């Protein structure tokens, strides 16, 4: 694509580097921003700057947060006896959108994948073991993707937790095999959590 402005070209290149956005969509966004009220563009720029400079990760569960503890871990009304283990932050958002789960979370930061060179030591698995030891929850719910990587990660963690008197369960397989949690519709996800099965 040929552009009449170097600044527009630079903006398009940066925006199109975002996932799911091609050059044409980036061009539409750039032209929209140029036509927008200057204050709106400034608010967007300020918001993006704050996002990079102020967002942190919850010290307890590794969810994104504005403070050292995320709003879920800091909420006294959440059931701390239930810890839902998820792959990433998108999964926390997906489960929260069901409005059915009232426990807390533990974000692993990925899944065990020898093919991609990701081992247990690169994930927040040891921290989960520490939490179980210190917090003594009643149940750990595995809400990981129904993939080989998800099953491998679940199996590895259950072996690490077998010495603790905690119930281990999997969300029901209403979530299609091979699918990622964040793309599962809210009704199916809510039912999968409600109808979770004990891990054997």
Curated annotation (Swiss-Prot):
Keywords: DNA damage, DNA recombination, DNA repair, Metal-binding, Zinc, Zinc-finger. A zinc finger (C4-type) spans 58-73. Signal peptide: none annotated. It comes from the Bacteria. GO terms for molecular function: DNA binding; zinc ion binding. InterPro entries: DNA_Rcmb_RecR (IPR000093), Rcmb_RecR (IPR023627), Rcmb_RecR_Znf (IPR015967), TOPRIM_dom (IPR006171), TOPRIM_RecR (IPR034137). Pfam families: RecR_C, RecR_HhH, RecR_ZnF, Toprim_4. Residues 81-176 form the Toprim domain. One of its GO terms (biological process) is DNA recombination. Coiled coil: none annotated. Belongs to the RecR family. PANTHER family: RECOMBINATION PROTEIN RECR. May play a role in DNA repair. It seems to be involved in an RecBC-independent recombinational process of DNA repair. It may act with RecF and RecO. This is Recombination protein RecR.
């Amino acid at each position: 694509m040929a552009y009449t402005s170097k600044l527009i070209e630079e903006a398009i290149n940066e925006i199109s580097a975002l996932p799911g956005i091609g050059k044409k969509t980036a061009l539409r966004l750039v032209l929209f921003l140029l036509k927008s009220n200057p204050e709106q563009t400034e608010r967007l720029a300020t918001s993006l700057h704050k996002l990079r400079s102020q967002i942190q990760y919850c010290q307890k569960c590794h969810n994104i947060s504005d403070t050292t503890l995320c709003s879920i871990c800091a909420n006294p009304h959440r059931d701390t006896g239930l810890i839902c283990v998820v792959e990433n932050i998108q999964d926390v958002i997906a489960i929260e959108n069901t409005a059915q789960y009232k426990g807390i979370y533990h974000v692993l930061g990925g899944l065990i994948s020898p093919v991609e060179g990701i081992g247990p030591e690169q994930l927040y698995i040891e921290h989960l073991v520490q939490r179980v030891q210190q917090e003594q929850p009643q149940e750990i719910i595995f809400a990981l993707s129904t993939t080989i990587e998800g099953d491998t990660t679940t199996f590895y963690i259950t072996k690490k937790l077998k010495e603790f008197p905690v119930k281990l369960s999997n969300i029901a397989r209403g979530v299609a095999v091979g699918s990622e949690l964040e793309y599962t519709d809210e009704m199916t996800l809510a039912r999968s959590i409600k109808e979770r099965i004990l891990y054997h």
